[in-house]
């Protein structure tokens, strides 16, 4: 049996005495700090204090000449699509474009005029009057879904209206192209920081030949003129995710994964040749949903993503090659103009990037970065961003930093970033009492993790867990979220599943329904399906595909596990709403079976709920769930309906959750549910801690164990190894305790 050397226990947290004992303040490296022209001396002081080995500029800040000789790496934020209004103004036809859809308007006679820009901000968007509307626009009767003939509508340029021959009391929309005359990210930063005198930055289309040639030559000149810059931080490449403002400068539509602003007649003509069929605006505007990630992607939209990946990655490689030719590193920011790069797609590695950096808002968004292959290193920009909205009246930057690190840390222990950093106005962070001390603690713990793991991987269970949705591996760690870790009432009960998984001892795969039909790999023991009915994450019409349901039934029947959260396998068909109701042991009452009596009774005595005290948080939950079949057990109920149910199905198990928002307790419940579903309960205590607020990570090759307290209170927890009690630990709030494991 493995034992612990109690004399080798090492504690790390924010306490100054503890930092002195562990030597954290003496460590350097793995940290990037922002700077600006008016904070040179303070930058040097903080660089030395925090042990930073890289400095960077940001949008709205400058790298001071006085810091160019500092013995650290210098990052320069580089924009391929903006910060050159002169070029954009000289070439208005090559300004970036976006597909918009007008308001839905009801005709009350046989003629209707639709104002195109109603509800849009005219400082951001301008109707494209240069290209033929009859070729690139589309008018649709939304009552019937039919496309209105181009002979039955006219564009009135002077009024920016479309006049349509209509059927009374039918609804109509116009899909049209507009120029992005104010870069969306610059507009966001302008509004957020209340900039007054900064010119609006136009955004130009690097995909088009004239601009492409200009941008390449400009990059070469920039590299020659900036010999002291070590890392070119592309922010990013060519197409901005969809970020559209309304006429009151409020965010109107935000889709972090959106392709609506990656279009132009030039690009679309190339797509038509590549795809072999005619392009329609509807492929992009998608009835007004703009192909939100929650939509089941159409064949045409998947084709468009494939085409864009090929084109974007090939052109990005040309820019990266230029950077490399000057002896510099090329880094990509995962955000802003990242559309088309698809880091989990099959073309990304061909770009040849040295690094990827992205914003870390949670464990999920950290894994979104740290799991990327095909680069030499990854970097996470931790929160909070040093902007006035946080570092101002009513803001709580220290609290935000603590919460951000608590979620990020558990994911780092599973899949570490190589570096961390911050962004924004360093002066704001420097002047906020206690904030720099908080960063010291975070950076110290990050370095300690790397020192103790020493490039090895943490222990994982002897089986894989797969998340099943329509996107599969293309959007690894990206599902069930609206906009990059932004909380939404409609999503947090599902997104919590991925947040829990991000720090758990499992290898997690993301698979699509096409993958299922090809056969489930033997190393996958548990499959999770989570989401609302008819979304891409639940699966919609895929659940009436005979090959899908029979393959999954066989998988569970032969010993696999299937976990459903929310409305899994949902599609009303043949007397069922949950198409795998027989596997899950539950279905949802849609009103059709109210005449059928249900006799549901709770029995919470189960392996999954051991160690669990108090009520379970199901978030928004899913209502009207009832258990059915002969082999179910209801572990939690809300009135007469079920919230947590387990079900025996052949040699395997089904588990159903009405919802699962992130919390330490829900992480523990899901952990136990996965081991139960896999039929491998005995493996759970290979390495285990009893308190639900704590988690354990083991680096077997280094004989190191980390126990973390994910709460803001002191707690006791018992450590088990190979099922045997080893030691009781008392952990301070947020503490990370390291122990040496010896034979």
Regions found by a protein language model. Give the residues of each.
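A short, well-structured beta->alpha microelement
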Residues: 31-44, 58-62, 332-341, 499-520
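Extracellular ligand-binding/catalytic regions of CAZymes and related secreted enzymes
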Residues: 243-246, 427-459, 576-579, 584-592, ...
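A glycine-rich, often tryptophan-bearing local segment used as a flexible ligand/cofactor-contacting loop or short
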Residues: 539-615
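The substrate-binding groove and active-site-proximal loops of carbohydrate-active enzymes
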Residues: 29-34, 53-54, 194-213, 296-313, ...
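A short helix->loop->beta-strand "cap" motif at the edges of active sites that frequently abuts
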Residues: 72, 327-328, 376, 558-561
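Catalytic domains of carbohydrate-active enzymes, especially glycoside hydrolases
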Residues: 38-73, 221-233, 407-414
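Polysaccharide-binding and catalytic clefts of secreted carbohydrate-active enzymes
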Residues: 92-350, 368
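Hydrophobic targeting/anchoring helices
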Residues: 50, 86-88, 219-220, 233-237, ...
């Amino acid at each position: 049996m493995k034992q612990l050397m109690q004399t080798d226990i090492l504690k790390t947290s924010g306490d100054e005495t503890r930092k002195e004992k562990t030597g954290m303040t003496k460590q350097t490296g793995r940290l990037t700090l922002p700077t600006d022209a008016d904070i040179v001396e303070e930058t040097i002081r903080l660089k030395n204090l925090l042990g930073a080995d890289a400095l960077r500029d940001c949008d709205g800040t400058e790298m001071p000449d006085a810091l160019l000789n500092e013995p650290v790496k210098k990052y320069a934020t580089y924009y391929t699509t903006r910060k050159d209004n002169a070029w954009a103004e000289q070439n208005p036809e090559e300004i970036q474009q976006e597909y918009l859809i007008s308001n839905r308007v009801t005709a009350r006679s046989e003629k209707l005029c639709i104002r195109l820009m109603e509800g849009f901000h005219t400082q951001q968007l301008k109707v494209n009057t240069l290209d033929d509307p009859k070729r690139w626009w589309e008018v649709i009767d939304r009552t019937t879904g039919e496309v209105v003939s181009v002979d039955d509508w006219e564009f009135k340029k002077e009024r920016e209206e479309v006049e349509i021959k209509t059927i009374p009391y039918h609804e109509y929309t116009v899909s049209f192209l507009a120029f992005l005359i104010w870069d969306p990210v610059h507009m966001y930063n302008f509004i957020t920081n209340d900039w007054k005198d900064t010119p609006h930055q136009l955004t130009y289309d690097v995909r088009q030949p004239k601009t492409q040639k200009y941008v390449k030559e400009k990059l070469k000149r920039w590299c020659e003129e900036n010999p002291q810059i070590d890392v070119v931080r592309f922010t990013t490449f060519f197409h901005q995710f969809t970020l559209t403002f309304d006429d009151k400068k409020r965010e109107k539509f935000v889709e972090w994964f959106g392709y609506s602003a990656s279009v132009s007649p030039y690009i679309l003509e190339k797509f038509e040749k590549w795809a072999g069929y005619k392009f329609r605006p509807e492929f992009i505007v998608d009835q007004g949903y703009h192909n939100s990630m929650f939509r089941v992607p159409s064949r045409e939209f998947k084709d468009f993503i494939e085409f864009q990946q090929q084109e974007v990655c090939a052109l990005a490689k040309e820019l990266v090659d230029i950077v490399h030719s000057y002896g510099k590193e090329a880094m990509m920011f995962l955000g802003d103009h990242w559309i088309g790069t698809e880091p989990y797609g099959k073309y990304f590695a061909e770009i040849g990037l040295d690094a990827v950096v992205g914003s870390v808002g949670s464990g999920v968004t950290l894994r979104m970065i740290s799991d990327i292959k095909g680069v030499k290193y990854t970097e996470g920009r931790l929160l909070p961003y040093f902007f006035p909205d946080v570092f101002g009246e009513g803001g709580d930057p220290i609290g935000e930093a603590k919460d951000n690190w608590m979620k990020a840390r558990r994911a780092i222990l599973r899949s570490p970033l190589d570096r961390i950093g911050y962004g924004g106005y360093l002066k704001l962070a420097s002047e906020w009492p206690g904030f720099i001390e908080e960063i010291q603690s975070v950076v110290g713990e990050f370095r300690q993790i790397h020192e103790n793991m020493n490039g090895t991987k943490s222990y994982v269970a002897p089986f894989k867990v797969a998340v099943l949705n329509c996107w599969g591996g293309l959007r690894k760690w990206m599902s069930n979220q609206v906009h990059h870790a932004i909380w939404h009432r409609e999503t947090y009960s599902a997104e919590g599943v991925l947040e829990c998984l991000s720090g758990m001892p499992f290898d997690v795969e993301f698979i699509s329904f096409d993958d299922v039909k090809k056969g489930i790999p033997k190393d996958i023991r548990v499959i999770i399906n989570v989401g609302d009915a008819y979304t891409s994450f639940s699966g919609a019409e895929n659940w009436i595909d005979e090959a899908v349901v029979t393959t999954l039934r066989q998988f569970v029947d032969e010993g696999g596990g299937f976990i459903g959260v929310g409305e899994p396998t949902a599609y009303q068909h043949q007397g069922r709403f949950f198409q795998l109701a027989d596997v899950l042991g539950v279905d949802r009452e849609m009103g059709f079976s109210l005449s059928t009596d249900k006799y549901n009774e709770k029995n919470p005595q189960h392996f999954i709920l051991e160690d669990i005290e108090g009520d379970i948080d199901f978030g928004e939950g899913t209502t009207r769930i009832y258990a059915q079949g002969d082999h179910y057990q209801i572990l939690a109920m809300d009135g007469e309906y079920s919230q947590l149910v387990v079900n025996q199905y052949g040699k395997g198990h089904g588990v159903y959750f009405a919802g699962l928002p992130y919390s330490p307790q829900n992480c523990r419940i899901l952990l136990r549910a996965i081991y139960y579903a896999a039929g491998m309960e005995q493996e759970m205590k290979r390495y285990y801690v009893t308190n639900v607020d704590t988690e354990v990570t083991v680096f077997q090759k280094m004989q190191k164990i980390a126990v973390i307290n994910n709460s803001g209170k002191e707690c006791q927890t018992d450590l088990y190894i190979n099922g045997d009690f080893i030691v009781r630990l008392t952990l301070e709030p947020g503490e990370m305790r390291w122990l040496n494991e010896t034979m």
